[in-house]
Amino acid sequence: MEVPRLSQHMSTPNSPCEEMIKNLSLENIQLCERDGNKSQDSGIAEMEELPVPHNIKISNITCDSFKISWDMDPKSKDRITHYFVDLNKKENKNSNKFKHKDVPTKLVAKAVPLPMTVRGHWFLSPRTEYTVAVQTASKQVDGDYAVSEWSEIIEFCTADYSKVHLTQLMEKAEAIAGRMLKFSVFYRNQHKEYFDYIREHHGNVMQPSPKDNSGSHGSPISAKLEGIFFSCNTEFNTGKPQQDSPYGRYRVEIPAEKLFNPNTNLYFGDFYCMYTAYHYVILVIAPMGSPGDEFCKQRLPQLSLSDNKFLTCTQEHDGLVFHQAQDVILEVIYTDPVDLSWGNVAEIIGHQLMSLSTADAKKDPSCKTCNISVGR
């Protein structure tokens, strides 16, 4: 996309950018305000009518790109030199929460054959609703533009991270995972009332529920994958489960082989931090052929059970042996129901550290360790 030089007396926010809008998110870009469907740019001429884009189509949507095409009257097509694309986050329409109110959202592109690809992680975020409208423009000899009326406004939503993006994220997580330590149980902390409710109303069986929105905004498992959250990190000096927890003073401990064995598949789900030095890796364990397994197979990178940097299960002469990464906090999601009778419920002797909870935690978008160069 080329951003042409415009007349100095043009007003914003409806003026096109003078250079590619790099390193800016839509939160820091001024929304275009239009009265009806006409351009209000004082430096843009409307000497001759140009075709108005209509029947706009959005296709090939990814987490940080999309293709756009439209129909228009072919009579003046030869005079069109540029397209103006007005792109806004739907949630920020009519918002005034901007630091840089003089920066337009309008993207300017040379008139290329349609469909045209719009790509850029500096203004597109994954799983986010946007509105888009288009003008056709003709560059004049004095550097100003003749423009069409605005098209209708179209809404669309960007996609989640693909497996390719998640693999990039996984490789960054592997770089800091550290050495592997033995462990023997998965554990889940909750309040006493939770376990009482499971016994009384669910026949002693914990049921999967939708994952919250913690972690990367583009993670395909957030609010979609159903599972049960477990931990497995151990105290460095004892090899036993950590004494403290942010989630409750009661804990169920399940022998590792009950949840993680050769009849399960293991997937990488996410890598994030919460403005702290701690980094979290989300892994998914799914019984082979289960609905959770089918969900993950389509969306997440699959890991070898015995050879990965985060969580392993290996067969030795004494049986299955389990290891977990020392330098990241593992959040393990098991996708099937779990009977409390598989393990033991008891009160912990440590503290309930609420400040360490990751419930609906937002990822630090500025962290160089756990972000990749696509929408955050």
Swiss-Prot record:
InterPro entries (UniProt xref): FN3_dom (IPR003961), FN3_sf (IPR036116), Ig-like_fold (IPR013783), PHYHIP/PHYHIPL (IPR042868), PHYIP/PHIPL_C (IPR045545)
PROSITE patterns: FN3
Function comment: May play a role in the development of the central system.
Taxonomic lineage from the root: Eukaryota, Metazoa, Chordata, Craniata, Vertebrata
One GO location term (cellular component): cytoplasm
Provenance organism: Xenopus laevis
One Pfam short name: PHYHIP_C
Segments forming domain Fibronectin type-III: 52-161
Family, per entry: Belongs to the PHYHIP family.
Name under which the protein is recorded: Phytanoyl-CoA hydroxylase-interacting protein-like
Disulfide pattern: none
